[in-house]
Amino acid sequence: AVKQWDGFNLSPGGPARVLPGGIVMGSAGANLPHQEARELLALDFAGNPLWRFDHNLQISTADGASVWSTRQHHDWQRSDFPAGYYAPGVDPQAVSGNTLLLTHVNHVVPDISDKMLEDDRLIEINADGEIVWEWLASDHIDELQYDAEERAAIHSAPGFTPGRGSFDWLHANSAHYVGPNHWFDEGDTRFAPDNVIISSRESSVVFVVARDGFVVWQLGPDFSRTPEQQAIGQIIGQHHAHIIPKGLPGAGNMLIFDNGGSSGYGAPS
């Protein structure tokens, strides 16, 4: 190793990213037994803190204290760094602009399940840590094209975890700004650069959310519904669904890491 920054915990919160000027941004802390971090940090090259955010929700610690936490898990993105990696013309900044965080919130939604949900909530914050936009997955389950069998399976909460006391029903594992792309330039507003692409590992679905909250594009969960999805076949347990940035080979295409394994709801196939 030629350089090391201390103070991060990437296991629950996802990637750390090196930004211009030797600034590193990533998640820190943990809220066990949940798979989530407590704060998002930016450190300079010497390891000095430049920016931090934790004022999302209050949680109780093991000793009963109430503390602020991001409850952030798996992914976060900068508005000026939509794919999370460098591409021509991309110049991300650490302490200006907006940041998108994938977070948890726990509640019961009887229409989904009578078990406590560990629901996915996207929040977008500005440089001052103010929440300027949010999206709650459970509010949009009817838009995600689950059939009756799949909804019944979700209602039974097969992934309920007693240790957590909750059911991570969607298990979103990535959330990216769409970013500049030729589809939008050609008039397809579903791919507006500030819309968000979300990957659901648990139900093998990738979808785009517009800024009004509605799901405007979707891949899965049933890959037999259209000839285009039949040609793909199936994705299972996928991660890092995003639009390839302008200036790179395949720009405008969606890149998905298809992990395989087991996921999805409904009757066994």
Tell what function each PLM region has:
Residues 1-269:
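Histidine-/acidic-rich catalytic cores in large beta-rich domains
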